[in-house]
Amino acid sequence: VIVAYRHEDGTVEEVSAGDLSALEAAAVEDVLGSTWQEIEQRLREKDPTAMRAIIWAGRRREDADLDFATFDLPQAGRRLRVGYERYEIDDILTAVLESSLAKSEDASMELAQQHLRNSAYRRSDVDAALEALGKGHLARRRPASED
């Protein structure tokens, strides 16, 4: 997932949890007292402390001594955002498609794409993933401003 923080000046800081190194991920586990699987779940649930930890890990690339206990993100409730990345959307849709084909069901694909539209970092990634799977008829044509 990508965690983004919008600064007061409007600039957006993005950190991909998937791009963290093993040591960075371990540091996040340590400060949160959670396993990586638990952290991923917390991110899916939009837990602000987990999102703060991902931004903290990204910032530690420039400031290795940055202390998590005092690391704050003003107005985090309004300025933090989390969403699936394209590769995650591809993985989810592929798994749902395979399951749907095995069971001759279309409903699960519809539900999955609705969930992904609400959870994707970039909504256009859902349409692109559907197109790539040959399910372009499920793609919504949205203006780029809705991304």
What is the meaning of each model-derived region?
Residues 1-14, 19-56, 60-147:
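Charged interaction scaffolds used for protein-protein
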